[in-house]
Amino acid sequence: MRLNTLSPAAGAKSAKKRVGRGIGSGLGKTGGRGVKGAGSRSGGGVRAGFEGGQMPLKIRMPKFGFYSRKGAVTAEVRLSEVAKVEGDVVDLNTLKQAGVITKGMQFAKIVLSGNIDRAVTVRGVSVTKGARAAIEAAGGKIEE
């Protein structure tokens, strides 16, 4: 076997569809595009979700809810990441300096994931019930 003798397996590649080449091909005259309408024209077609003028499903369904913009500037911090912060005080600035959260974050919440084995003081950062218990069990405290 040589590189110049390699070829695809028989039946692996199908021949290109040749449209508009006689009625015997099954794709003659209109070339599989049907008769008249936007889909038959060159460059034609309808956008995704268009239902021929009928009120689209997306608009027929009721509107509900909204996306809170606060979620985009709130970081979720694991307890194991809090342990990486140097110093005894954990606040928004120390979390940013340690590289735990990005500089665009305005709020943070510490969640119980992992463990902490030293006492830290959490200041100005919200904490879940489980994380609060773990921090206090390690000798730390939470200041609102």
Curated annotation (Swiss-Prot):
GO molecular function: rRNA binding; structural constituent of ribosome
Gene Ontology CC terms: cytosolic large ribosomal subunit
Ribonucleoprotein listed as a keyword: yes
One of the GO biological process terms: translation
Gene3D superfamilies: 3.100.10.10
Keyword match rRNA-binding: yes
Positions of disulphide bridges: none
Residue ranges of the region described as Disordered: 1-50
Function field: Binds to the 23S rRNA.
Protein family per UniProt: Belongs to the universal ribosomal protein uL15 family.
Subunit description: Part of the 50S ribosomal subunit.
Designated name of the protein: Large ribosomal subunit protein uL15
